[in-house]
């Protein structure tokens, strides 16, 4: 599945005037600005007529009045990858990168995502939805220690706590509930942390190389993700070939199950006791910073950051456009 990306010719002129949506008003604004800045520079280097656009500073209706032909969504978190901006772009009739309205909304909600994956028979850790510190303590009793407590609809490990004792439950619940009234308690899978990007859509969706993540003392938090160099990323991942292929198969199935398109990145834990992979979540607007993982995975198969950005942009589409043809001459979303 990761043998190589399909060969494609992209007519830069056919892309038209492009808005790189960045910033926004979520808790991940700072990271979004870094992602968007990198994408903007890469697209301009390839001759694309690309411009920065911050939805928290300008009304989205200006995209139409200013003649933008498509959008590269580099927004993270609420209003950027939860179906909100995707719905607005559908109404404006401006094609955009990444999954559509429904897939974006579902993937942003970790609980709904896990329910669908579980229904489809895909492996994901056991969980509880809680609404109080007392319920969090009960979840710890049910799921065992350690346990992960996190907001249902945030990313970048924001609001996340690894709980190892009942005394931590109240503080963990309070932190998570600051970001979302729906708090997820999830069984902790002891083992190796990996992540794997997916590009394409439907039968054409394909996984990129798996990345194995080794964080200091297992602490892969917001700071270590974006602002330090202490976390180690292994790509090639160094896993047995059969394990990597199984992870790639699993993430493509998870991607298709949620009806994603364009691109996404799924996080997986490999349980140490039996080497079984478990899906944690899927990110439908992955980071594109200097520390980000999709560009790292693409580089491992010979695809540069600039080429990756161009390919993602060329696949911009709309839910409402059946049979649309993109700048690479491929059919759009069905």
From Swiss-Prot:
It catalyses: 2 D-alanine + ATP = D-alanyl-D-alanine + ADP + phosphate + H(+). It comes from the Bacteria. Mg(2+) 2 binds at residues 281, 283. ATP binds at residues 140-195. SUPFAM superfamilies: Glutathione synthetase ATP-binding domain-like, PreATP-grasp domain. Binds 2 magnesium or manganese ions per subunit. Its cofactor is Mg(2+); Mn(2+). One of its GO terms (cellular component) is cytosol. Its main location: cytoplasm. NCBIfam families: D_ala_D_alaTIGR, PRK01372.1. This is D-alanine--D-alanine ligase. It comes from Paracidovorax citrulli (strain AAC00-1) (Acidovorax citrulli).
């Amino acid at each position: 599945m990761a043998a190589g990306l399909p060969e494609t010719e992209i007519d830069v002129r056919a892309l038209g005037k492009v808005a790189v949506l960045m910033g926004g008003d979520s808790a991940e604004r700072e990271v979004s600005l870094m992602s968007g800045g990198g994408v903007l520079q890469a697209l301009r280097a390839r001759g694309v007529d690309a411009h920065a656009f911050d939805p928290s500073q300008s009304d989205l209706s200006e995209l139409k009045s200013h003649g933008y032909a498509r959008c590269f969504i580099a927004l993270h978190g609420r209003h950027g990858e939860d179906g909100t901006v995707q719905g607005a772009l559908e109404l404006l009739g401006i094609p955009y990168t990444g999954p559509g309205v429904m897939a974006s909304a579902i993937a942003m909600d970790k609980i709904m995502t896990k329910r669908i994956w579980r229904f489809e028979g895909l492996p994901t850790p056991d969980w509880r939805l809680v609404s109080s510190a007392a319920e969090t303590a009960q979840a710890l009793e049910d799921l065992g220690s350690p346990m992960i407590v996190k907001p249902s609809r945030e990313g970048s490990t924001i609001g996340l706590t690894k709980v190892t004792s009942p005394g931590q439950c109240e503080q963990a619940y309070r932190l998570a509930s600051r970001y979302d009234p729906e708090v997820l308690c999830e069984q902790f899978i002891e083992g190796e942390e990996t992540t794997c990007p997916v590009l394409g859509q439907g039968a054409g969706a394909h996984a990129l190389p798996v990345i194995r993540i080794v964080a200091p003392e297992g602490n892969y938090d917001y700071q270590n993700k974006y602002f330090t160099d202490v976390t180690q990323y292994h790509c090639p991942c160094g896993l047995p070939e059969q394990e990597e292929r199984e992870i790639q198969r699993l993430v493509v199935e998870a991607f298709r199950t949620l009806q994603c398109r364009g691109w996404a990145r799924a996080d997986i834990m490999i349980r140490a006791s039996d080497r079984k992979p478990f899906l944690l979540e899927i990110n439908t607007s992955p980071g594109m910073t200097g520390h980000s993982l999709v560009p790292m995975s693409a580089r491992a198969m010979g695809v540069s950051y600039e080429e990756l950005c161009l390919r993602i942009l060329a696949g911009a589409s709309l839910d409402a456009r059946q049979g649309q043809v993109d700048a690479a001459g491929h059919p759009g979303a069905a």
